[in-house]
């Protein structure tokens, strides 16, 4: 069975299964090895910046910020406008609509359409009574 090699820790894991790799990458020894690995490149970058600037200390980004990254509530191309939560719109809903979005689907009440050739079954009797009470037309004579 092939073994998994961790380049940060410079060691082989006993098994090549996702659970073993996950538990290794969560571990304290691996986290420290990754931190040391990237600190090495940070020191090299600092030295190269010192040489390019002629001895001046380069500007470091504020604590917690990485160059080129936006804060988590910012969208590229917007000016200090926080992102909206999912499912919400940046404008208010039309009058009569709730704030949460579209209302649930509601069925329209059934009504009798006098122009429809056949009324619903529960209204057939009332339609027959309506027709019997109406005055006779010229075609009936």
Swiss-Prot record:
Biased composition (Pro residues): 83-97
Keywords recorded for this protein, A-Z: Metal-binding, Nucleus, Ribonucleoprotein, RNA-binding, Zinc, Zinc-finger
Region (Disordered): 69-141
Pfam families reported in the protein's UniProt record: zf-U1
GO biological process: mRNA 5'-splice site recognition; spliceosomal snRNP assembly
Coiled-coil boundaries: none
Cited function: Component of the spliceosomal U1 snRNP, which is essential for recognition of the pre-mRNA 5' splice-site and the subsequent assembly of the spliceosome. SNRPC/U1-C is directly involved in initial 5' splice-site recognition for both constitutive and regulated alternative splicing. The interaction with the 5' splice-site seems to precede base-pairing between the pre-mRNA and the U1 snRNA. Stimulates commitment or early (E) complex formation by stabilizing the base pairing of the 5' end of the U1 snRNA and the 5' splice-site region.
Subunit structure: Component of the U1 snRNP. The U1 snRNP is composed of the U1 snRNA and the 7 core Sm proteins SNRPB, SNRPD1, SNRPD2, SNRPD3, SNRPE, SNRPF and SNRPG that assemble in a heptameric protein ring on the Sm site of the small nuclear RNA to form the core snRNP, and at least 3 U1 snRNP-specific proteins SNRNP70/U1-70K, SNRPA/U1-A and SNRPC/U1-C. SNRPC/U1-C interacts with U1 snRNA and the 5' splice-site region of the pre-mRNA.
The name this protein goes by in its record: U1 small nuclear ribonucleoprotein C
Organism, as annotated: Heterostelium pallidum (strain ATCC 26659 / Pp 5 / PN500)
Biological classification of the source: Eukaryota, Amoebozoa, Evosea, Eumycetozoa, Dictyostelia
């Amino acid at each position: 069975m092939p073994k998994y090699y961790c380049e940060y820790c410079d060691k082989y894991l006993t098994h090549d299964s996702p659970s073993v790799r996950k538990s290794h990458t969560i571990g304290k020894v691996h986290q420290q090895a990754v931190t040391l690995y990237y600190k090495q490149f940070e020191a090299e970058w600092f030295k190269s910046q010192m040489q390019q600037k002629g001895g001046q200390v380069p500007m470091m980004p504020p604590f917690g910020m990485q160059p080129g990254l936006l804060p988590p509530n910012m969208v590229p191309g917007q000016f200090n406008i926080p992102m909206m939560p999912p499912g919400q719109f940046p404008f208010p809903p039309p009058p009569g609509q709730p704030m949460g979005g579209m209302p649930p689907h509601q069925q329209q009440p059934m009504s009798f359409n006098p122009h429809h050739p056949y009324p619903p079954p529960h209204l057939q009797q009332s339609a027959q009574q309506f027709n019997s009470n109406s005055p006779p037309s010229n075609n009936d004579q």
